[in-house]
């Protein structure tokens, strides 16, 4: 929109271009360009020199190679220090990012980083990419900055003329911060009709765990809000951002995010993340737990430092997570009563919408079109959630006993029911709707699932009714003996894909199957007495 006022976090490079060698050009900048910066020439994003070369048709890192940091390759780099390594989690549960600190004579590198994922693992053996290496400056569109000489090298695209071109590099992590104080919230700030672009990649900043979910997150974005009330972000464009686009941190009330176009971003589009101080008896890793005798059994949050009654409505979100892979179109953690409605979310590496834990529920996810999801990862959902709340324990036998003795404990954190209704969902490498570890107190109805079906894993009190699952069906995984789950009046296209159940919940019945064999198998499990095909 030519009417948009533009807010950029970039600086301009001016000078005279000279030939370096072959097709590579150079310019003396007199300015420092961070390896976490993004470079644009006449508005075209350039590619930091990398191996393997950039290929837009490849989902994982736009090109990957098992030998990205093999000693045989590293030995040919004059100065490996400062190279950036990106690698997927071995289970493809997001990714990691590292910096090469040093290398020995044999080409073995020493790395720092890898702190961006709350489920640590070795690097994926195949899905790896390395960048910021001068010797890998070998393809059109690539660039490299030599900080020791203050020289920028560019291998221009075909027909790209550098003389008099506008050369910009990002220099900021945030563009606007709206921050009140804990005792004096800032209110009634409206951002409308603005274009936000050009921020740094933030994957090596400080990350924090989102309780026991798989996520670590950088608490920052192009637009960052904290301690706000009744603010609006409307009809804006967010593009060419290295990290998150919008981040509501801690206390936020009645924030409205509506009618925005968010695309070409390195991390997540919209994040609602409360402060962990608001959580009772928090744990911060999958394997971490608090002894039951020491758990605070008071229901609900401890403070008010979390987002409440915020809306994400009628936004177009696509092509995000271009750098970081544990990302989402809308991310919710330690928040309550968030409404996500009428959004189109697609072309994302992981979930379109993610809820990290049960704290504190009451969300409404409705009328969203979420597709082309989990494109560069695995074992996830177009909608994904976890629920490793106070009742949850990494040892299943211990958790069985805790929940048997305290059947209402899942409601301590998931104090309100989260509703998922009237959505169209499609997942490429997982489930269309994935209520994973511990997700509790959900009501799913009137959803159209196009590819991956619906999965419910080891949680409590989920009701799933009147949904259509095309090309797939129902996936109940490792249910508790008395989970209280209900699965009724749904249309499925396969038999039930149960795994290690201790029981079949409160009710599984009145469903429509594709054929007699699938129905008979369900009846043999003691379910679907009144179902048909």
Describe these PLM feature segments.
Residues 44, 55, 509-510, 514-533:
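Aromatic- and carboxylate-lined catalytic core of secreted/periplasmic carbohydrate-active enzymes
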């Amino acid at each position: 929109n030519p009417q948009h006022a533009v807010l950029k976090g970039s600086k301009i490079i001016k000078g005279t271009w000279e030939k370096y060698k072959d097709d590579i050009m150079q310019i003396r900048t007199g300015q420092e360009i961070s390896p976490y910066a993004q470079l644009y020439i006449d508005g075209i994003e350039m590619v930091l020199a990398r191996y393997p070369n950039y290929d837009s048709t490849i989902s994982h890192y736009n090109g990957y190679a098992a030998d990205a940091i093999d000693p045989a390759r590293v030995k040919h780099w004059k100065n490996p220090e400062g190279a950036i390594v990106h690698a997927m989690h071995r289970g493809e549960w997001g990714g990691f990012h590292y910096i090469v600190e040093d290398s020995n004579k044999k080409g073995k590198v020493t790395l720092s980083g890898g702190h961006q994922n709350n489920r640590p693992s070795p690097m994926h053996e195949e899905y790896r990419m390395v960048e910021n290496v001068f010797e890998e400056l070998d393809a059109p569109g690539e660039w490299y900055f030599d900080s020791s000489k203050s020289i920028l090298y560019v291998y221009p695209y075909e027909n790209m003329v550098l003389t008099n071109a506008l050369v910009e590099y990002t220099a900021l992590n945030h563009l606007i911060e709206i921050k009140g104080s804990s005792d004096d919230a800032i209110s009634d700030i409206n951002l409308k009709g603005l274009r936000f672009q050009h921020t740094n990649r933030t994957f090596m900043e400080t990350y924090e765990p989102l309780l026991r979910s798989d996520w670590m997150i950088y608490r920052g974005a192009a637009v960052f809000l904290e301690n706000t009330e009744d603010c609006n972000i409307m009809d804006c464009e967010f593009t060419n951002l290295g990290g998150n686009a919008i981040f509501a941190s801690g206390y936020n009330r009645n924030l409205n995010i509506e009618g925005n176009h968010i695309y070409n971003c390195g991390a997540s589009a919209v994040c609602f993340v409360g402060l962990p101080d608001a959580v009772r008896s928090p744990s911060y890793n999958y394997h971490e737990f608090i002894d039951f005798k020491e758990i605070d059994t008071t229901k609900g949050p401890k403070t008010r430092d979390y987002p409440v009654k915020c809306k994400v409505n009628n936004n177009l979100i696509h092509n995000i997570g271009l750098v970081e892979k544990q990302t989402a179109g809308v991310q919710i953690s330690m928040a309550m009563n968030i409404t996500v409605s009428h959004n189109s979310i697609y072309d994302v590496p992981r979930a379109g919408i993610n809820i990290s834990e049960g704290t504190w529920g009451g969300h409404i996810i409705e009328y969203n079109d979420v597709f082309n999801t989990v494109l560069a990862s695995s074992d996830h959902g177009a909608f994904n959630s976890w629920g490793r709340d106070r009742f949850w324990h990494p040892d299943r036998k211990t958790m069985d006993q805790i929940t048997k003795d305290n059947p209402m404990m899942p409601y301590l954190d998931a104090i309100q029911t989260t509703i998922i209704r009237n959505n169209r969902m499609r997942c490429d490498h997982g489930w269309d709707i994935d209520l994973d570890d511990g997700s509790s107190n959900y009501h799913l109805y009137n959803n159209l699932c196009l590819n991956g079906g619906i999965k419910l894993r080891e949680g409590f009190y989920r009701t799933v009714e009147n949904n259509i699952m095309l090309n797939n069906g129902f996936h109940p995984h490792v249910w508790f003996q008395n989970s209280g789950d209900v699965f009724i009046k749904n249309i499925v296209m396969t038999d039930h894909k149960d795994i290690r159940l201790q029981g079949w919940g409160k009710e599984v019945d009145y469903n429509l199957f594709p054929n007699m064999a699938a129905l008979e198998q369900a009846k043999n499990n003691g379910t679907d007495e009144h179902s048909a095909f």
